Amino acid sequence: MSDFDSSNFDFFKYKPDYAKIAEAAFSRLSFTFTKEHLENVIKAALAPDASENDKYVCSCILKNAEVAAKGKFPLCQDTGIANIFGWNNGSIIPEDISNQLTKGTAKIYDEKKLRFSTSCPSSFYEEFDPKNNMPAQISIFTNGAALAPTPSFAEKAPKGSLSLLFCAKGGGSSNKTSFIQGTKAFLTKERFTNLIKEQLGKFGTSACPPYTIAIVAGGLSPEQNLLTLKLATMGAYSDMTHTPNKDVFRDSELEEIAMQIARDSGYGAQFGGSRFALETVVIRLPRHGASCPISFGVSCSAHRNLRAVVTNNGFYLEKTVSNPAELEGFSEATRPANEKSEKSGGNELHLNTENGIAALLASLKAAKPGDRVLLSGKILVARDAAHARWQKLIDAGNKLPEYTTKYPICYAGPARTPEGEVIGSFGPTTAGRMDVYAESLMSRGAALITLAKGNRSQPWTDACAKYGAVYLGTPGGIAALIANEYIRGQEIIDYEDLGMEAVRLVDVENLPCFVITDSLGNDFYKQIAEKSKK
C-alpha cells in the first residue's frame, strides 16, 4: 500500500467521477470546518490572555459554524473563488479533468445558493457577472514536477492516485497577499523579524482574524514563492519538516516570533486583544543568488480547505465536523456570545435607525472607539459597484439617490437567499475600498454612518472629523449567524443588475457593531497601533 493515513477521511466507493468529487468537496467545505480548525478557535476563545472582545468574536465564529453546519447558510457570504490543486501520483486522469471539476463546482455554487463573486471582462474597463462564479482556478501537477513543494499527504498517497486540495478563497484574505523581491540582506534574524513586524502590522483586521498567517522566504522564481505561500495558507504544509535542509523546511523559531508579534499587535480577533492569529507558518526555499523573494499572506477565520485522494476504487474526502457543539470546550467557548445576546441587556448602546441619521449621530456621541453597539432598524446595503455608480452621477452633475442620505450604509454583498429564508449569509466587506468616496459622499450628506470591517485610511478618518461621521465595525466571519439571527427582512431598491452588489434595504435587529471611528476622528485601530509601539 503506502504511508497514506486514511483515518481522517471518509471513503466513497465508486468509479472516479471528478464532477461528483468537486461537488462533494465544495458542498462540504462551504458549510463545515475541519475539527482542527474549530479546536484552534476554541483554544483562542479560552486563552488566558484573550481580551473580552477576543472571546466575544471567537464565540460568534463558533456559533456561526454551528448555524452553517445545518447546510442552509454558508460559513461566509463570500463563498470565494474555487481553487483546486492536484498532484498526480501515476493516475491515468481524463483529458477533460478540468472541465469535469469545473462542472461539479459550478453545480454546487448554483444548487447551494452560494454567492457569485466573479466579474468577467467584456472590455478592458467593463465587466459582467457570469452568474456561475466561474472560472475556477485549477492546477494539476505531477508529484515529481510540481511548481511548489508537494504536500506530504500527496507524497504519501497510494501509487496510481490523484491527490486534490480544494479551497474557497475569499477576496478579503487574498487581498492581504504581499510580495517583496528582496535580497540576501533580509536574511538576518534582526532584519527579518523587523520585516515580519512591518508586514503583519499592514494586515489589519479587514480579512477577518484570527488568521492563519503564512510567510515564505526564497524560491527559484516569484511564482514558486507565491504558490508555496498560497498552499501554506491552505494548510498544505502542516506536516512539513522543521529540520533545515537544502530543499524546503519550516522554521520553528521564526514561527514563534511571528506568533508573538501577532499577539503584541493588539489587533486581536478584530476588535482589540491578543488573538490575531491561530497559527503561523514560516517556510524557507532555495533561491537565486541575486534575489530573495519574500511573501506574506493569510487565511481568514473562514478557513475553507479540504483534501481528497482519488484512487481507482473511489475517493477519500477529508472529514469535517457536522455538529460543532459536540466538541470539547465548545459550550464554554460560546458563552460570551450567549451571555451578550439581546436578552442579557449588558452595557451595549442600543440604537434604532427609525429616528434618522441625525438622531443616530447624536446618540453615538456618547460612545468611545471600541464600544459595542447593537443596531436595529433599516440599513442601506451597498458596496463597490454601487459606489462607483453614485460617483458617476456626481461626476455628471446629478444628485445622489435620496436613499443614500436616509440610512446608515453597510458595505456587504450577501450570498444568494436559500429557499424559505429572508436572506443568504450576510457579512461586511472591507471598508477601505470605499475610502476614496469619503469627500464625495459625506459632503452631500451620505455615508455619515457606515458599517463594514477592518481599518480605514487617514483621509476617511479626517472626513469623519470634518463632517461628524461615524464608522462602525461589524464582526467578519459570522455571516451565517447574522443571516439567521439578526436580519428580519430585505428588499432590492436599486441596481438589481449588479447581482450580489445590488443596493438593498435590510432590516436588522440587535446587529452587533463596534465603534471604530467616532465623530471627532478618533480611530480605534490607530489607538491600538500607537499603544503596541510603546
List the model feature ranges, each with a label.
Residues 1-215, 220-345, 424, 442:
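Non-transmembrane, aqueous-exposed alpha-helical and coiled segments at domain scale
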Residues 236-262, 266, 270, 381-511:
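Feature captures the catalytic cores and cofactor-binding loops of soluble hydro-lyases/lyases
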Residues 364-367, 373:
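Short, well-ordered loop/turn sites that connect or cap secondary structure elements
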Residues 347-359:
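Short, structured beta-strand/loop micro-motifs enriched in basic residues and often containing a Trp
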Residues 273-280, 287-288, 484-534:
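C-terminal binding/interaction regions
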Residues 182, 228-232, 295-299, 312-314, ...:
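Short, solvent-exposed amphipathic alpha-helical segments in soluble enzyme
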